[in-house]
From Swiss-Prot:
This is Regulator of chromosome condensation. InterPro entries: Ran_GTPase-activating, RCC1/BLIP-II, Reg_chr_condens. Transmembrane segments: none annotated. The lineage of its organism: Eukaryota, Metazoa, Chordata, Craniata, Vertebrata. A motif (Bipartite nuclear localization signal) lies at residues 4-24.
Length: 421
């Protein structure tokens, strides 16, 4: 064997790996269609991005961002937008660093501002007080903090929040990021799930109940250092690999390569589709989603409810029913299995806020239901809607809706002008 071959076997230091070696990641969840950002609801900490004088909007309002946007995500009290060129803009509450940028100038958190990242970003996710950005070569940057019932637990290090982006140390490329209120799920190119953040309700899928409160004897590192969710696969060696993952506020859904739906975390209103209401600390293969004719393609979870969709464009809901958040009509009660929301046209995506639900239809309209208190439904009223209501407004005229995302008290839409025929 020539010495040249032997030399090649040694792995070079990470910083010596040439840029061209880096793999470009892709996943069906990456958005590429550019549009305009609209916000509505309550915005007293700037999460609407409409400046210091606008505290609420009962109808969608246009946010001024200097570039076309391909993804717009609502966190608990902040909003994150990804531009077509791979830049990240943020606005809203920055107390814990969720904006990832300096907002010392008064009012600068109330309007979109750019996050300093040298990398091209292909996907963002946002929680209550954290934000994640996935780069085109599969690295994840994170900023803000995670909290549990007792307050801040830190971000990547115990008790330390970060006001600027920091890279998550993982030696495998990530293809998708998803955020719950206080946890982050990363899906790798190999189909592994890495989780970090708060684990109190089981939402990390890898921390036993005994250690879920602040990590037990190992401390917060157990929660904040990303680790893989290991689940033995039946009948074969190795472990279950996943093709997709989604988060609710305190829970996680993951779809395996075989198409099975797994869930872990809070299910106190059956929002995971479990027969019981105990939290699940390890992934459960959810029998309520087993139906040979359906393949599940999208999930979104609020505080206590879930809205999901199948490959035929039908939307379903389960979990807590108060305030109409299931969209199943007046007087609907709690559901422990996915229940068809019958009054909707064919759907292309679904989303949940804390106590609201949304569906974007294949023809580019958006329907909303649930709690009306924060004006998140776009009806102009603060009454609850027990059935889906089509969202209307001046900014929606002659436009198609590309996506919707919803936080604690505000909602963000991505829209584009209808093509003139």
């Amino acid at each position: 064997m020539s010495p040249k071959r032997i030399a090649k076997r040694r792995s070079p230091p990470a910083d010596a790996i040439p840029k061209s070696k880096k793999v470009k990641v892709s996943h069906r969840s990456h958005s590429t269609e550019p549009g305009l950002v609209l916000t509505l609801g309550q915005g007293d900490v700037g999460q609407l991005g409409l400046g210091e004088n606008v505290m609420e909007r009962k109808k969608p309002a246009l946010v001024s961002i200097p570039e076309d946007v391909v993804q717009a995500e609502a966190g608990g009290m902040h909003t994150v937008c990804l531009s077509k060129s791979g830049q990240v803009y943020s606005f809203g509450c920055n107390d814990e660093g969720a904006l990832g940028r300096d907002t010392s100038v008064e009012g600068s958190e109330m309007v979109p501002g750019k996050v300093e990242l040298q990398e091209k970003v292909v996907q963002v996710s946002a929680g209550d007080s954290h934000t994640a950005a996935l780069t085109d070569d599969g690295r994840v940057f994170l900023w803000g903090s995670f909290r549990d019932n007792n307050g801040v637990i830190g971000l990547l290090e115990p008790m330390k929040k970060s006001m600027v982006p920091v890279q998550v140390q993982l030696d495998v490329p990530v293809v998708k990021v998803a955020s719950g209120n206080d946890h982050l799920v990363m899906l790798t190119a190999d189909g592994d799930l890495y989780t970090l953040g708060c684990g109190e309700q089981g939402q990390l899928g890898r921390v036993p109940e005994l250690f879920a409160n602040r990590g037990g004897r190992q401390g917060l590192e157990r929660l904040l250092v990303p680790k893989c969710v290991m689940l033995k696969s039946r009948g074969s060696r190795g472990h279950v690999r996943f093709q997709d993952a989604f988060c609710g506020a305190y829970f996680t859904f993951a779809i395996s390569h075989e198409g099975h739906v797994y869930g872990f975390g809070l299910s106190n209103y059956h929002q995971l589709g479990t027969p019981g209401t105990e939290s699940c600390f390890i992934p459960q293969n959810l029998t309520s989603f087993k139906n040979s004719t359906k393949s599940w393609v999208g999930f979104s979870g609020g505080q206590h409810h879930t809205v999901c969709m199948d490959s035929e464009g039908k939307a379903y809901s389960l979990g807590r029913a108060e305030y109409g958040r299931l969209g199943l009509g007046e007087g609907a009660e709690e559901k422990s299995i996915p229940t068809l929301i019958s009054r909707l046209p064919a759907v292309s995506s679904v989303a949940c806020g804390a106590s609201v639900g949304y569906a974007v239809t294949k023809d580019g309209r958006v329907f909303a239901w649930g709690m009306g208190t924060n004006y998140q439904l776009g009806t102009g009223q603060d009454e609850d809607a027990w059935s889906p209501v089509e969202m209307m407004g001046k900014q929606l005229e002659n436009r198609v809706v590309l996506s919707v995302s919803s936080g604690g008290q505000h909602t963000v839409l991505l829209v584009k002008d209808k093509e003139q025929s």
